[in-house]
Amino acid sequence: MELLAPNLRVVFCGINPGLSSAHQGYPFANGSNRFWKVIHQAGFTESQLAPEQWQQLKDNGCGITALVARPTVAASELSRDELRSGGEALQEKILRYQPRALAILGKQAFTTAFGVKNAPWGKQTLTLGETEVWVLPNPSGLNRATLEQLTASYRELFLALQ
């Protein structure tokens, strides 16, 4: 469940697939996950895509990947070593494809995977080659952020890429 190509505007990087996504074969497939609604409301897609339409993200200049490929019920089941290893692999992919931005969906996952302390939300000072790195709230239904808060965070990235 990875969609990478040269010249993308943004690559959205989830933490890892949930069991629903692993079973269905689509990223962010759990009905409680707000990813598809949020990226549409933020402006990244003209219409709201369903999880099974995930490959159409590329038509909108967007890619998708995950820090860790192993599916779990909750991201908290991942070890620090898995996240660090995933961060190293992610950096290699981003350096190869060089999208304009990498959006990591989750602050704790970012700080662990990249060895960064006290990262703010939004644009980071860290870049990967020419790629800007952003940290956005995870759209999981387990995240307490409201739909409006999520959309505002993702919209900030969308507007920065205009």
UniProtKB/Swiss-Prot annotation:
Reaction(s) catalysed by this chain's protein: Specifically hydrolyzes mismatched double-stranded DNA and polynucleotides, releasing free uracil
Record has Lipoprotein as a keyword: no
Cross-referenced Gene3D superfamilies: Uracil-DNA glycosylase-like domain (3.40.470.10)
GO molecular function: DNA binding; pyrimidine-specific mismatch base pair DNA N-glycosylase activity; uracil DNA N-glycosylase activity
GO biological process, one term: base-excision repair, AP site formation
Keywords, in A-Z order: Cytoplasm, DNA damage, DNA excision, DNA repair, DNA-binding, Hydrolase
Predominant location category: cytoplasm
NCBIfam families: PRK10201.1
Name of this protein: G/U mismatch-specific DNA glycosylase
Higher taxonomy: Bacteria, Pseudomonadati, Pseudomonadota, Gammaproteobacteria, Enterobacterales
Name of the coding gene: mug
